Structure formats: structure tokens, C-alpha cells
Amino acid sequence: MAKRPTETERCIESLIAIFQKHAGRDGNNTKISKTEFLIFMNTELAAFTQNQKDPGVLDRMMKKLDLDSDGQLDFQEFLNLIGGLAIACHDSFIKSTQK
């Protein structure tokens, strides 16, 4: 009998599925276009997006994440976004527990 995936393995599977869901909207499931990025941010990270006071923040994020400057995010570039957000959330959590 096969073992069930661990919580970490399920998280990885979820990240892959979310990337594929958003990358596949325009037919290319290997990269997220700018339009797909905006949809991703407004649906999957809606609270983060809605809390931004600067309307240009998403454009700047896309440019900063797009390391090869092709106007799209591959899976590694997508993971850089997720990792950066996870670090920021962890830092916030640590600060809140030290009060």
C-alpha cells in the first residue's frame, strides 16, 4: 500500500497545481504571463494585493521576479515570489510572538 503524501509533499503538489492552473490560461503551461500574474495575484493573494496602497506595485514585482526579462515567470521565478512572501509572513509571525 502506498504511503499518503506528507503535509510538505501536499504543499509542494499544491504549489505545482496552482502554477499550472494560472500558467495554462493562455495555452502555455510552462510560464505565467503578465496577465496571468495579475489574475494570480488578485485571486490567490487577494488580501496582499488589496492591502497595497501603490497601484504600480504588481508591475514592479513582475519586473523584479522576471530574472530573464522575457516578460513571463517560469516556475523558478514563481517560487521566488512564494518564498519571498513566506519569509515576510514568517518574519511578521516572529515579531508578533516576541511582544
From Swiss-Prot:
Briefly state the modifications made to the protein after translation. Phosphorylation at Thr-8 significantly suppresses homodimerization and promotes association with NCL/nucleolin which induces nuclear translocation.
Q: Name one GO molecular function term.
A: S100 protein binding
- At the top level of its lineage, which domain of life is listed? Eukaryota
- Residues that, per the record, bind Ca(2+) 2: D66, D68, D70, Q72, E77
Residues bearing Phosphothreonine are T8
> What positions are modified (N-acetylmethionine)?
M1
Cite the entry's keywords alphabetically: Acetylation, Calcium, Cytoplasm, Disulfide bond, Metal-binding, Nucleus, Phosphoprotein, Repeat
Q: One cellular component GO annotation, for this chain's record?
A: cytoplasm
Biological process according to GO: regulation of cell population proliferation
Query: Main role?
Result: Facilitates the differentiation and the cornification of keratinocytes.
Q: How does it assemble?
A: Homodimer; disulfide-linked.
Q: What name goes with this protein?
A: Protein S100-A11
